[in-house]
Amino acid sequence: MDKEKKLLSRKLAKVRGWIQAVATLLTNIHIPNLFKGKIYQGNAKTVCVPGLNCYSCPAATGACPIGAFQAVVGSSRFKFSYYITGFFILLGVTLGRFICGFLCPFGWFQDLLHKIPGKKLSTAKLKPLRYLKYVILIVFVILLPMLVTNSIGMGDPFFCKYICPQGVLEGAIPLSIGNAAIRSALGKLFSFKCMILIAVIVLSILFYRPFCKWICPLGAIYSLFNKVSLLKITVDSSKCVGCGQCSKACKMDVDVCKTPDHPECIRCGACIKACPKDAICYRFMGKSCQKNDNR
């Protein structure tokens, strides 16, 4: 076992919260805009950020990849976007759902909510709901923006408009506080989206990351690359004693020993910290935490 790699893996897992905080700050660097009710519209807004972060957030540094993708497929001049597709492939192949675990602002928001003291419920018996996010990806992110269009052939960003709670949290609420015109224009759709946000908040206190597990289309996209991503979690079979502590620690309901590269794994490192034999670590570009592993 490579002790240095194991030590680095444990350190990375331990400082995950700080990395999430820094990632959220960098993703929303224009903080003064929160008090002005204005959206930053500089050149950086043409670049997508890796996690789910609303374009309409006054502090947002860049564009939301899901919002950008819907803008492309819903355009009357729709054509295959090499930029957006390449963005998903590059990040997916490189990091997979590590982005969900370390770099996504809304993922961190759910983590903080789940730390609120109180009774916590398991999602182990709700595994079929995992597939809902793929349905949402196909229907609300791809098909509806393409097929349901207005008189000039433009489709709505259906996921952003009707489902995404991050848009309300980061966009509508801050903008309405700082902008009287926007505040006066709020209607039933805003109320409906607020109900979704409240539901996600309550569920996040009870369950671990319900939005990530069941709803998020961005997580659905990144999950498709988990088995082939360069960054993975690997188990040293020569050290593993089958105690099951890693799977008990996994809040994403993954059997770590059997499927460490499962689509639901967000690379949070909980299993690394829980392993009493230091048999689990991060692996990048095929370099395993097992000395004699030549994969």
Predicted features along the sequence, with ranges:
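Non-ligating segments of multi-cofactor redox enzymes
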Residues: 1-257, 263-295
